[in-house]
Amino acid sequence: MARIAGINIPDQKHAVIALTAIYGIGKTRSQAILAEVGIAEDVKISELTEEQIDQLRDGVAKYTVEGDLRREVSMNIKRLMDLGCYRGLRHRRSLPLRGQRTKTNARTRKGPRKPIKK
């Protein structure tokens, strides 16, 4: 298994799909990295040489991925909560942020129903 950005990349998948195992790299970004490095999308990771894997590592290193990206996202959410803005308050209360209705629905965000104690 090739190891890129601290993640074991699946060997038996095509390169374009295998790179999406890294948090922060989707299919479009994966295609862009492969085009930049000059590797075909339909080549399996097991067929790549060490030199090509090193080129992939360099291509992925140009982006914010994995732990750094997770940290950045959580810091952005924490900043919104500290500011006390509307989005921060909605995060704090675990409610939908983007104007969805909450009288009905929104169960995924709110969690299971809590019974009213009498």
From Swiss-Prot:
Single GO term (MF): rRNA binding
InterPro entries: Rbsml_uS13_C (IPR027437), Ribosomal_uS13 (IPR001892), Ribosomal_uS13-like_H2TH (IPR010979), Ribosomal_uS13_bac-type (IPR019980), Ribosomal_uS13_CS (IPR018269)
Ranges for region Disordered: 94-118
Alphabetized UniProt keyword annotations: Ribonucleoprotein, Ribosomal protein, RNA-binding, rRNA-binding, tRNA-binding
Domain of life according to the entry: Bacteria
One Gene Ontology term from the biological process aspect of the record: translation
Pfam families referenced in this protein's UniProt entry, alphabetically: Ribosomal_S13
The protein's role, per its UniProt record: Located at the top of the head of the 30S subunit, it contacts several helices of the 16S rRNA. In the 70S ribosome it contacts the 23S rRNA (bridge B1a) and protein L5 of the 50S subunit (bridge B1b), connecting the 2 subunits; these bridges are implicated in subunit movement. Contacts the tRNAs in the A and P-sites.
Subunit structure: Part of the 30S ribosomal subunit. Forms a loose heterodimer with protein S19. Forms two bridges to the 50S subunit in the 70S ribosome.
Protein name, per record: Small ribosomal subunit protein uS13
Primary gene name: rpsM
